[in-house]
Amino acid sequence: GMFNIRFAMPTRTNGQHSNHLYPNDYFPFTYGESVDPFSGRSDGVLKRSMASGTEPKIMHIQTSNEYWVRGGSLPHTNPEGTEDAVLPNGVRFYTLGGSQHGSGSGLPRPASSGQLAPNPNRWSPLSESLMAAMVRWIAEGAEPPPSRYPRIADGSLVASHNGQEINHDAWNPLPGINHPTAIYQPGVADYGMRWASERIIDTHPQTARGYYNPLVPAVNLDNNDSAETTVLSPLTQVPLATFVPWNLRAVATGAPLSL
């Protein structure tokens, strides 16, 4: 959701299929500074706090699902998706591999609103461990585990598609399993004169002026995420199946080609 705009709806998000142009994902994405290719503006999430010496310690924890449905690579790349961003010293980034948005219970469940059964990977103990590390980092000055996330430089962060075709570095097609024809891309639009400085919407745009370029984690031949570039739970460290982070909408739900 989004909190920093007038009349924000904290639980509402835009996606590939719904809530297009709701201002949920917009520049700047990175904690350090990057340049917006559309406006030429240089900015970063922590720019003001770094200038005042009040920057917080941050653990950014997300799953591999966020790369497909939320533009999850943009906090650690430039907006064009051509190079890795530099994380400030007080920021750690952890990508939880082979996982859906919310932690599973470890037990399988039948499919419902999606074409695939919900991903059962139970990753909540990983976030709980990182929370304990955060407390030690703040209270005792103990360094937390190093960041672990896929990167452009080593080939572990890749394009989801090559043109209209799925990129086999991102997904190896399986018989009987439909795969996404596109992923969610945050758009840039005109919300009026007060948007940039006050986060007040004076104009509700009907179209985007352009789109940023999110990437996704590369997978192995079994379509599972790597232990070297994502944090894996025991269930996904020695997988007995493919732990898919995305799920296309069920036919009964509608828009079955959408995430």
Where are these regions (language model features)?
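C-terminal His-loop and adjacent cap/lid subdomain of alpha/beta-hydrolase
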Residues: 1-259
